[in-house]
Amino acid sequence: MSDVYLSIIIPVYNGETTIQSLFNQIDDFCKKNQFKFEVIFVWDCGIDNSWKVIEAIQLKHPGVVCGIHLSRNFGQHNAILAGINKASGNYIITMDEDLQHDPKDILLLLDKQKSTNAD
């Protein structure tokens, strides 16, 4: 069993303006809850500078942030699958890059999993 508790996969397509803020929210949430975590950004060949932002976050947070650079645009589902293949956490969560998911809601998902013993 992995020592990483939570893998958070974020498919990225033109998320240059949101992914730093999203990572900061995830980082704060996981540290507050004392979760050992990893964030896997999967860049799906958008047309903005998302990959440069991912590289910068990865440099600041080695061992926590992983960037996957897809060779072309494969679509959101395939980007998620690429992230799942890289994930090492006991639990895997997917989040969109555009801040529509609040990292605090991760607790609701984990509580539901524990109360129902869901996969």
Regions found by a protein language model. Give the residues of each.
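Structured catalytic core of nucleotide-sugar glycosyltransferases
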Residues: 1-119
